[in-house]
From Swiss-Prot:
Descriptive protein name: Histone-lysine N-methyltransferase EHMT1
Cytoplasm recorded as keyword: no
Main enzyme class: transferase
Residue numbers spanned by region Interaction with histone H3: 1162-1181, 1242-1245
Result, substituting A43V: In a breast cancer sample; somatic mutation
Residues where Zn(2+) 1 binds: C1062, C1064, C1068, C1073
Length: 1298
């Protein structure tokens, strides 16, 4: 660590010189207890072989030939306790006598090593001991009275001056023990015997004296892959259905028909049809669920069965068909859904519910509450007016009995049924004479009469098709939906929407929840229809889309059961080929055309299942699009191009295609709808768009707009609170919701329902088992409903509740770019630093998605760490780089993001920029001094990555910045070998290599990386080692440790009861902090840098908060204990051996690194041969100790001396307050630019010893220890000596410094 690391030439003929100790003069210091900070890491034994570089001493192996120097007068009274007479046998601390056999030494050194004699130190190494007989007494040395002690590095401070009163606070700390207690060092010190030799002096670094220019000169105001999209748990289908089935099917009203497929008559097949009808909007939730298409299990805890084909005889052998009927009856019959040939009847709902309830253990209640068939029949005969009158005027007892039956019937189960339950109920009713073709509308009306509470506010209406009176499916889940008008509350006006578009009006209440995601019916069959069969004429009715052209299939038909992809498409008779393709979900549910060849969207909920559909045919609900087959978000689907099969086509193009009738492209169950000529895809899309039901908004139902974020747009906090109080006092008696409904209502923004449910006592923290245990607050935050978030928080929702994947509501809002929701949650007290199951914070999620404003707000909040890393080691900057968010990269860079942080595979941002191929980001990173030559764990440089990924622009950029085209990775591949042969990238690399090979004058050796991290991962930031000067390998004659270690007992006071601590509840920035008072004040600003008024010339002691304090670990008064944070590099200098430089701009006052090594006593330092790495821990109240970084140390052991240093050592106490063992922390004194070498002042006493061996080569114009300055001082000293008449003694020290 030499100041000059230059070769030293000892003076010829001069006696062997002692290395002197440098100590600091300390004034009075307040007593306090002590410790060392962190668990000392005992490193392994280091090699003793000399590497020719000593960073502060001579680089030759004869460094032991220094002339002995006497100690300073302050230390002259001290005698080494180990020194006896010259003839005595010396015994090392480990008990090995120097007269022992050579076997005690043979395992440690060789004859040409630093060690010249055989003293074994406490660290297990053989220490060099010159022959004692040749050691002159220090009292006889001509320099005895003028030289200080050891030539150790010292701390800054005025020599010979006591510390000023302001240097250390005189606080009545009242420690339990006086300074130095717990150690008998002082008592054990022996008085020198008469005639005894004085102890040997060693060179030690010390704190420098006050030097002009030490003060800070200027103030410079200076964050792979995607976490592999969360592997969603593959849930069983029965869990999906039992979850989704609990949602309500809202009451019918006149406009409902316009928002559902026409001509469906809402077939009396609610249970089975729901497998293809809309599931609730829960399908759009971000916690995606994997569905196994076609094998829906609609009954919880029951195994699903695959639908199997049945013959016509099997289907109808026990069913009496009505041969005579009206055309309308036939249409309705054709519309009735059959699963495996079995018709479904509405009067099976009660049986379904009974079975479902039995599964959940409610069978006993069900049996008592169910109405009989006779009662249902009698109710069926009631008129509409009678039903309305009954709903209003029915006695309370009768109403309660019906309500109880229906509520228990619905419970929290779905009104969906599975194939197995259908078969059971079919067998129960096998002997009944009911015709399966009975009008479903009549049975639906019957249910509405006997269950008024199942669909409050429902109204009957006429179908626009005009055939049968229809009603929407009632809510069989038992959730009460009550309009405010019916509640007769005083706060009705308050609860009404005060913001336009807010979904909380009385009319909107009836439309809430209608926006369900339609699912396909590709695996459903309907019994054959005579009209459609006649129309088909024994030919397949499939229409194929081939490269935007439509054609008809001409294959013959074998089976006449009808199929269609969705309710929007007509029923078709298909050939065996198209039947198979229908089952494989290759028919688009939006238009009914088979996706044969061309560009289509393909959704893959599972690896073995794929769904094809047209991009424009995706289901759209609330401005979001979903797969029309399974309801997954269409953003998960990918666009695929399917080549046209090279086989004899069975599809004949239809010439002269004309725009079809109004029925084409819409849901049509009439028998003649399939007879019209097919349309081109453009015409088809136009037709589909033109036939959207009147008044139907594909982005959401009329009046159901997403509420504008921000409480200012809706009811205020006071209004909501008063409404809750009023509702609580006037709670409706007949209101009952299931807790799961709160989740769906919160997600859909249904303010009134959420309010009513909270009033009803539903737990706002109820977690959905089948939604990854997410709470209603998760759902509201994900959708950006700030008003509902506020309502839930006011009702007691845990704002930091975690889902199964450890996501918080704030993460959901940040990931989905809901800035107002993010602001509200943070202001409401949400934590910003929790991590999900993959270690991502909300900042990671927002950066990955490119949400600029959200990232900006999170960083401006002041609580986010811009360089936080997830479980993969990726920072927000890495995510923004991979996803090519250029503006976000600039923002993060301006906020202090570290572009050289490495992930778990040691990639830096430039690797990811090369991977993504974004040359703009690559240029930004290179302009910010990103390391172009950095290699990852596989040895790949950014050029390797760019070549492998065929990123031509990035390759050209890297080559223009002198990237090494010959560098080999661990597989032995150069970037040229990584590129595809004869590609554009390959050609560019080949040309660059040819130019380098043909260069006549080869430049100096290219900088090569000799170690990617000298710390071996022990530091948070890797420290690479490079060499562009010679062939010297990375230094290996020491053991890298990140914390101070000991090799012999030090008796450091680590008693926690001896610590003085603070009880702060803030960030310890106030004057009340006890730790700050010990330091006079807290010297750190909010960025962890020293304040401008900090005394760099004579730094005071700094007491950081410790583990006994009551403050948080991230308080302001904790900086050094956070470890190394600056990007440093060990490199080979041309004339000073190894040095350390910064790879980034370091603002003034920034903690850079700590001087780490082996803690040894002053007496042991005297017997150590190599004294270039000693740092004196001056202490005037007891035994003096040193840090020796010769055998154990960190990167600071390579920092060279500089006469105008950019670093200053400061004594810091953290985990202990033992004043004998401060930790030495280096802080920047000024702005350190990237690439600048680091240096600190070793101290005058170091150069008093080492100046005779070599000179300083720092190159500063104010250098005080250069050969010229040394010669000038020697000449002046000689002249003064002659004038005083004294003999000239300077000849002994006038040797050539080189």
């Amino acid at each position: 660590m030499a100041a000059a690391d230059a070769e030293a030439v000892p003076a010829r003929g001069e006696p062997q010189q002692d290395c002197c100790v440098k100590t600091e003069l300390l004034g009075e210091e307040t007593p306090m207890a002590a410790d060392e900070g962190s668990a000392e890491k005992q490193a392994g034994e280091a090699h003793m072989a000399a590497d020719g570089e000593t960073n502060g001493s001579c680089e030759n192996s004869d460094a032991s030939s220094h002339a002995n120097a006497a100690k300073h007068t302050q230390d002259s009274a001290r005698v080494n306790p180990q020194d006896g007479t010259n003839t005595l046998t010396r015994i090392a601390e480990n008990g090995v006598s120097e007269r022992d056999s050579e076997a005690a030494k043979q395992n440690h050194v060789t004859a040409d090593d630093f060690v010249q004699t055989s003293v074994i130190g406490s660290n297990g190494y053989i220490l060099n001991k010159p022959a004692l007989q040749a050691q002159p007494l220090r009292t006889t040395s001509t320099l005895a009275s003028s030289l200080p002690g050891h030539a150790a590095k010292t701390l800054p401070g005025g020599a010979g001056k006591g510390r000023t009163p302001s240097a250390f606070p005189q606080t009545p700390a009242a420690p339990p023990a006086t300074l130095g207690e717990g150690s008998a060092d002082t008592e054990d010190r022996k008085l020198p015997a008469p005639g005894a030799d004085v102890k040997v002096h060693r060179a030690r670094k010390t704190m420098p004296k006050s030097v002009v220019g030490l003060h800070a000169a200027s103030k410079d105001p200076r964050e792979v892959r995607e976490a592999r999209d969360h592997k969603e748990p593959k849930e069983e289908i029965n869990k999906n259905i039992s979850d989704f089935g609990r949602q309500q099917l809202l009451p019918p009203f006149p406009s409902l028909h316009q928002s559902l497929p026409q001509n469906q008559c809402y077939m009396a097949t609610t249970k089975s049809q729901t497998a293809c009808l809309p599931f609730v909007l829960a399908a759009a939730v971000s916690r995606k669920k994997k569905r196994r298409m076609g094998t829906y299990s609609l009954v919880p805890k029951k195994k699903t069965k695959v639908l199997k084909q049945r013959t016509v005889i099997e289907m109808f052998k026990s069913i009496t068909h009505s041969t005579v009927g009206s055309k309308g009856e036939k249409d309705l019959g054709a519309s009735s859904l059959h699963v495996n040939g079995e018709s479904l009847e509405m009067d099976s709902d009660e049986d379904d519910s009974e079975e479902l309830e039995e599964d959940d253990g409610h069978g006993a209640e069900q049996a008592a509450a169910f109405p009989t068939e006779d009662s249902r029949t009698s109710k069926e005969s009631m008129s509409e007016a009678d039903r309305a009158q009954k709903m209003d005027g029915e006695s309370e007892e009768e109403q309660e009995s019906v309500d109880t039956g229906e509520e228990e019937e619905g419970g929290d189960e779905s009104d969906l049924s599975s194939e197995s339950s259908i078969k059971k109920k079919f067998l129960k009713r096998k002997g009944k004479t009911d015709s399966p073709w009975i009008k479903p509308a009549r049975k639906r009306r019957r249910r509405s009469r006997k269950k008024p509470s199942g669909a409050l506010g429902s109204e009957s209406y006429k179908s626009s098709a005009g055939s049968a009176e229809q009603t929407a499916p009632g809510d069989s889940t038992g959730y009460m939906e009550v309009s405010l008008d019916s509640l007769d509350l005083r706060v009705k006006g308050i609860l009404s929407s005060q913001a336009e578009g807010l979904a909380n009006g009385p009319d909107v209440l009836e439309t809430d929840g209608l926006q369900e995601v339609p699912l396909c019916s590709c695996r459903m069959e309907t019994p054959k229809s005579r009209e459609i069969t006649t129309l088909a004429n024994n030919q397949c009715m499939a229409t194929e889309s081939v490269d935007h052209e439509l054609g008809r299939c001409t294959n013959s038909v074998v089976k006449y059961e009808l199929m269609r992809p969705s309710n929007k498409a007509p029923l078709l008779v298909l050939c065996e080929d198209h039947r198979g393709r229908m089952v494989k979900h290759q028919c688009c549910p939006g238009c009914g055309y088979f996706c044969t060849a061309g560009n289509f969207m393909e959704c893959q909920p599972e690896s073995s299942i794929s769904h094809r559909f047209h991009k424009d045919c995706a289901s759209r609900v609330n401005n979001a699009s979903y797969c029309p087959h399974c309801g997954e978000e269409s953003s998960k689907a990918k666009e695929v191009t399917i080549a046209k099969a090279d086989t004899t086509s069975t599809v004949t193009p239809v010439p002269g295609q004309e725009k079809g009738s109004a029925l084409e492209g819409r849901a049509d169950t009439t028998t003649g709808s399939a007879a019209g000529p097919p349309l081109s895809e453009d015409d088809k899309l136009q037709g589909a768009a033109s036939h959207v039901p009147e008044g139907f908004d594909p982005t959401g139902p009329a009046g159901l707009g997403r509420p504008t974020p921000g409480l200012s747009q809706g009811p205020g906090k006071e209004t909501l609170e008063s409404a809750l109080i009023a509702l609580d006092s006037e709670k409706p008696k007949k209101l009952r919701f299931h807790p799961k409904q709160l989740y769906f209502s919160a997600r859909q923004g249904e303010l009134q329902k959420v309010l009513l449910m909270l009033v009803d006592g539903i737990d706002p923290n109820f977690k959905m088992e089948h939604q990854n245990k997410r709470s209603p607050l998760h759902a509201a935050a994900e959708a950006g409903h700030v008003d509902i978030c506020h309502m839930l928080v006011q009702a007691g929702a845990n704002i930091d509740t975690c889902s199964e994947d450890q996501r918080t509501p704030l993460m959901e809002a940040a990931e989905n770019n809901h800035l107002e929701a993010v602001k509200y949650l943070i202001k409401a007290g949400a934590l910003v630093d929790p991590k999900d199951a993959e270690g991502s914070t909300c900042l990671h999620l927002a950066a990955k998605k490119g949400h600029y404003e959200v990232v900006q707000y999170l960083l401006s909040n002041g609580q986010m760490d811009v360089n936080c890393q997830d479980d993969g080691g990726w920072t927000p900057m890495i995510w923004a780089t991979e996803y090519k968010h250029v503006d976000l990269v600039k923002l993060l860079l301006s906020k202090g993001s570290d572009i050289n942080i490495r992930d778990n595979e040691e990639n830096i941002c430039l690797h990811w920029a090369a991977f993504s191929g974004c040359v703009d980001i690559a240029e930004i990173l290179l302009a910010a001094k990103c390391d172009l030559h950095a290699v990852n764990i596989h040895g790949d440089s950014p050029l390797h990555i760019a070549a492998r990924e065929n990123r031509y622009d990035c390759v050209v950029l890297f080559l223009s910045r002198d990237s090494d085209v010959t560098l080999k990775n661990k597989e032995g591949e150069t970037p040229l070998q990584c590129a595809s042969l004869n590609s554009q990238v390959w050609s560019a690399l080949q040309m660059s290599k040819a130019l380098q090979d043909s260069a006549p004058d080869r430049p100096s050796p290219v900088e090569r990386i000799v170690s990617r991290d000298i710390a071996r991962g022990y530091e948070r930031i890797p420290i690479p080692c490079v060499n562009a000067v010679d062939s010297e390998p990375c230094p290996s004659n020491y053991k890298y440790v990140s914390q101070n270690c000991v090799t012999s007992p030090m008796n450091i006071d680590r008693n926690i009861t001896h610590l003085q601590y603070c009880v702060c509840i803030d960030d310890c920035s106030s004057s009340n902090c006890m730790c700050g008072q010990l330091s006079m004040r807290c010297w750190y600003d909010k960025d962890g840098r020293l304040l401008p008024e900090f005394n760099m010339a004579e730094p005071p002691l700094i007491f950081e908060c410790n583990h006994a304090c009551s403050c948080w670990r991230n308080c302001r008064n904790r900086v050094v204990q956070n470890g190394l944070r600056a990007r440093l590099q060990l490199y080979r200098t041309r004339d000073m051996g190894w040095g350390v430089r910064s790879l980034q701009d370091i603002p003034p006052g920034t903690f850079v690194c700590e001087y780490v090594g082996e803690l040894i006593s002053d007496s042991e330092a005297d017997v150590r041969e190599e004294d270039s790495y000693l740092f004196d821990l001056d202490n005037k109240d007891g035994e003096v100790y040193c840090i020796d970084a010769r055998f154990y140390g960190n990167v600071s052991r390579f920092i060279n001396h500089h006469c105008e240093p950019n670093l200053v050592p400061v004594r810091v106490f953290m985990a202990h307050q033992d004043l004998r063992f401060p930790r030495i922390a280096f802080f920047s004194t000024r702005l350190i630019e990237a690439g600048e070498q680091l240096g600190f002042d070793y101290g005058e006493r170091f150069w008093d010893i080492k100046g005779k061996l070599f000179s300083c080569r720092c190159g500063s114009p104010k250098c005080r220890h250069s050969s010229a300055a040394l010669a000038q001082r020697q000449a002046s000293a000689a002249q003064e000596a002659q004038e005083d008449g004294l003999p000239d003694t300077s000849s002994a020290a006038a040797a050539d410094p080189l």
